[in-house]
Amino acid sequence: MRVIDGGVTAPKGFKANGYKEGKFGVAIIISEKDAVGAGTFTTNKVVAHPVVLSRELIKNRDKFRAIVANSGNANCFTKDGMEDAKEMQRLVAELFNINEDEVLVASTGVIGRKMDMNIIKDRINKVYNLIKEGNSSINAAKAIMTTDTKPKEIAVEFEVNGKTVRVGGIAKGAGMIAPNMLHATMLCFITTDIEIDKESLTNILQKVVDKTFNNISVDGDTSTNDTVFVLANGLSGVNYEECGEEFENALLYVCRELAKMIVKDGEGATKFMEVVVKGAKTEEDAVKASKAIVNSLLVKTAVFGGDPNWGRIVAAVGYSGADFNPEVVDVILSNYKDEVYLVKDGIPLADEGTEELKKAEEIMKSDEIKIVVDLKMGEFENVCYGCDLSYEYVRINAEYTT
């Protein structure tokens, strides 16, 4: 497997482009033939209208031709939101001469504001004309940005019996990131030219989302609009049964890299952190403990301040609900070059005036840090990704709708 250019347009038979002016943008991804579709969505009880619409579409049909997404308005908690989401479907279907039910819809932006459909129609028409002229995955990625500071895209390919399979993706997200998608707003659209059935694609996607997007945190909020779509059009000529493990690894890589990009672009973020909890008695314990650490506001602010306050880490594990014996735990801090034990076998090492504390303080100056907690209770492990919480985060969100 190798990384290539092209994002969602790298796989055969996919076109994409986007247009944004001011706060309002639209991206469209289109497949030249029917593509098997799968998706996962927010578990927030307040659900945006495009999520309701697309969730039903995914539930009731197997194949799709297009994805349309707008930025600047979440189309959530509004009187005419469902009609507006369906109008987006209709506009795209009419331009590309496909059925309305073949169009999946997503939105991101401010909650509770009515969509200005004149703006949406203008943007959709502009993107249609751009797609006729050429492909631009990066333009599509830029069009769905809200508080993001940079577009997020990636693509990979691998060989199977002389044929090439490609997987590409774009994503957006910088705030309201603590996805929990069983079936900033976090949007991710993935394309692939592998041939695969809906059941297999759905199962693989859920497994991958659990390992990636459901393990990231910027601010601990779960959006009303979180969505991941995958379209697979089969144009590589390679069936999933020929390369199951390779395809899963490719999809996992794409989603993990996009998840990391989202975290690194977290609103006001200055530092990236990887949290590994290992030695847990159960998988559930590993997940609980790692998420408690990565979501802890006290841990996030300590990371921002460069403070190796390991007490906040063990406190988070303690309230996580995971089975945990403080008398045996290890806590290790690293910057991927140097590492230091903050706690070993339940004994604090990074105490006032120690070499361990000095080393920890140097490590905390790095832009990327890794926290490893070994519970020594079993064999299970989970990895989460997060970022610090800065003054800038407060400013961005205090001024979001103004």
Swiss-Prot record:
Thermal characteristics: Optimum temperature is above 95 degrees Celsius.
Subcellular locations according to the entry: Cytoplasm
Annotated Pfam families: ArgJ (PF01960)
pH effect on activity, per entry: Optimum pH is 8.
Catalyses which reaction(s): N(2)-acetyl-L-ornithine + L-glutamate = N-acetyl-L-glutamate + L-ornithine
Site feature Cleavage, where: 184-185
Annotated site location: Involved in the stabilization of negative charge on the oxyanion by the formation of the oxyanion hole: 108-109
Protein EC: 2.3.1.35
One Gene Ontology term of the molecular function aspect: L-glutamate N-acetyltransferase activity
Chain sites annotated for binding substrate: 146, 172, 185, 267, 397, 402
Regulation of activity: Competitively inhibited by L-ornithine.
Pathway: Amino-acid biosynthesis; L-arginine biosynthesis; L-ornithine and N-acetyl-L-glutamate from L-glutamate and N(2)-acetyl-L-ornithine (cyclic): step 1/1
Signal peptide as annotated in the record: none
GO term, biological process aspect, one: L-arginine biosynthetic process
Keywords, alphabetical: Acyltransferase, Amino-acid biosynthesis, Arginine biosynthesis, Autocatalytic cleavage, Cytoplasm, Transferase
GO CC terms, sorted: cytoplasm
Keyword set includes Acyltransferase: yes
CDD domains hit by this protein: OAT
Chief localisation class: cytoplasm
Function: Catalyzes the transfer of the acetyl group from N(2)-acetylornithine to glutamate, forming N-acetylglutamate and L-ornithine.
Family stated for the protein in its record: Belongs to the ArgJ family.
PANTHER family: ARGININE BIOSYNTHESIS BIFUNCTIONAL PROTEIN ARGJ (PTHR23100), ARGININE BIOSYNTHESIS BIFUNCTIONAL PROTEIN ARGJ, MITOCHONDRIAL (PTHR23100:SF0)
Name of the protein: Glutamate N-acetyltransferase
Organism: Methanocaldococcus jannaschii (strain ATCC 43067 / DSM 2661 / JAL-1 / JCM 10045 / NBRC 100440)
